[in-house]
Amino acid sequence: MTVDPEELRKMETGDLLKKLDELKLELIKLRVQSRMGTLKNTASIRNTRKDIARILTVLSEKKKVKREKVENK
C-alpha cells in the first residue's frame, strides 16, 4: 500500500494528518504482530514507515510554502 507523493500533495492538511494517524496505528499493530510472530509480510513494517515519512515530508513542504507566502507579503 505505497502512497504516491503526488497524490499526497493534492490532499488537504487535515486529511494528511488523519492518514498519518491511521498509518501510525497500523505500524503499532504490525510491530505487535511481529513480536508475537504472526506477521507474515515483514516488509509491510518498512513500507508503512516509508509512507509515514512521505506524509511528513509533504506536510513540511506545505508548511514551508505557507511560511514563504507570509514572509513575502
Curated annotation (Swiss-Prot):
One GO BP: translation
This protein's UniProt keywords: Ribonucleoprotein, Ribosomal protein
Domain of life of the native organism: Archaea
GO molecular function, one term: structural constituent of ribosome
InterPro entries per UniProt: Ribosomal_protein_uL29, Ribosomal_uL29, Ribosomal_uL29_CS, Ribosomal_uL29_sf
GO cellular component terms listed in the entry, alphabetical order: cytosolic large ribosomal subunit
SUPFAM superfamilies for this protein: Ribosomal protein L29 (L29p)
Keyword Nucleus: no
Family: Belongs to the universal ribosomal protein uL29 family.
NCBIfam families cross-referenced by the UniProt entry: L29
UniProt protein name: Large ribosomal subunit protein uL29
